[in-house]
Each structure stands twice: as structure tokens, then as C-alpha cells.
Regions:
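...captures the hydrophobic TM-helix bundle architecture rather than a specific catalytic motif
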Residues: 1-222
Length: 222
């Protein structure tokens, strides 16, 4: 039968949720013409948020690249950066990303004990990372190398501090989510939050690897 009937508009074959036949569309679980599932729409919106966040960090990276040599005769990255501590931070954050993925898999299996355990481990690794970062900032400020010392340090504190702020907010999100999971169980909205948190944490890992390479490694060698 033709898609165009009397008094009705033609059906869009590319509409989200429409299959090529009469069965369910594999991406949404709905029949042709049906709406996308809540999981798909939330994940899509969260990816847009992550992309906007990456664009923001791109601006910080660009500013740092321009100002990295503007030390105003003050300390440089080679004078300030302790690669041993930064390597430890990197190991902690990468490991926390792995345990965060395990927490997401455990939540999909509806294993409360495993999900809570891996979320807790993820939070502990993230808190240890943040502690080392705050310790680094405090040491630099005590050595008169604060953000007001030079344009280079302003760009450094802005970039690394923004990432640290994201980690801190992620830890607050993690703690809230653990409480919700304990009280409400594996509701669909809780599972979506665990999935989105895992995406967020992986994105912070990717950004940190870029910071570790472009800021610390290159800065300590120049």
C-alpha cells in the first residue's frame, strides 16, 4: 500500500524509530514511526553536553599553547612540574575509569554489591587524584608561582583547575548516585545515570591524557 493515503501526510522513512519492515527498529525497540527510547534520547543529549565540554577545553588548550612561553621571567614548567606525582595522578585516574566501567557492567547485571563496590573504588581513586592535584597547586602557590605570577601560570591553573573542578563535581555526582542506587534500586533512570557517569568519567580521562602529554611532558622537557 502506498505511504500516501487520502487526507494523510506521507510517512518519513528516515524518522527515528522507523524500521524498513513491520518489525521493531533495533536501535529504539519501537515499531516504525515510533519514538526513540528514553535511553537513546538521554544518551544523545549527554553526548551533546560532552562535546560542548570538549569544545570549552579546546579553548583552554589553545590559550595555554599561546601563553606557555609567557613566563614573565618567572618559573617555567621545567622548574615546577613533578612528573612522578603527575604520573601517579594519571595512573589513579585511568584506573578509576576502568573501575567505573566495571560498575556500569555490574549495574546492567543488577548486582547491587558489585555495582556499589566498584563505584566506591572509583570514587576513592578519583579523590586520591584530586588530593594530589590540590597538593600540587598548594605547593606552587607557596613557592610564589600562583596564577597571578605570569600569563603562563594563569593559563596553566585555568586549564588544570577546570579539569580538577570537573573531577570534584563528578565525585559529588558519584556519591549522590550511590545513595540513589541504594535507596531506589536498579530503576531505568538510575541505570541511565550510571551509564552517563561512565561516559563523563571516560571523557575526563581523555582530557587528562591530553593535559599530561601537552602540558606536563612537553613543559618539563622544554
Amino acid at each position: 500500500m502506498s505511504d500516501i493515503t487520502a487526507g494523510s501526510a506521507p510517512r518519513d522513512p528516515y524518522r527515528l524509530g522507523r524500521s524498513h519492515g513491520d518489525g521493531l527498529f533495533s536501535a529504539t525497540g519501537h515499531g516504525e514511526g515510533g519514538p526513540a527510547s528514553k535511553f537513546v534520547t538521554v544518551a544523545y543529549g549527554f553526548w551533546i553536553f560532552l562535546l560542548s565540554d570538549i569544545i570549552m577545553f579546546s579553548g583552554f588548550f589553545a590559550a595555554y599553547a599561546v601563553l606557555s612561553k609567557a613566563t614573565a621571567d618567572g618559573p617555567t614548567g621545567k622548574d615546577l612540574f613533578e612528573l612522578t606525582r603527575v604520573a601517579a595522578q594519571t595512573g589513579l585516574l585511568l584506573t578509576s575509569s576502568f573501575t567505573g566501567g566495571l560498575a556500569m557492567l555490574a549495574s546492567r547485571r543488577r548486582s547491587m554489591a558489585a555495582a556499589q563496590f566498584w563505584l566506591l573504588v572509583t570514587g576513592l581513586f578519583g579523590a586520591a587524584f584530586l588530593f594530589l592535584e590540590v597538593q600540587e597547586f598548594a605547593t606552587m602557590v607557596n613557592e610564589q608561582a600562583g596564577p597571578s605570577r605570569s600569563a603562563f601560570l594563569s593559563a596553566f591553573f585555568a586549564l588544570v583547575g577546570c579539569h580538577g573542578t570537573h573531577v570534584g563535581l563528578g565525585l559529588l555526582w558519584l556519591g549522590t548516585m550511590m545513595a540513589q542506587l541504594w535507596v531506589k534500586g536498579f530503576r531505568p533512570e538510575i541505570l541511565r545515570r550510571v551509564h552517563c557517569f561512565s561516559l563523563f568519567w571516560h571523557a575526563l580521562d581523555i582530557i587528562w591524557v591530553a593535559i599530561f602529554t601537552l602540558v606536563y611532558l612537553l613543559g618539563a622537557s622544554s
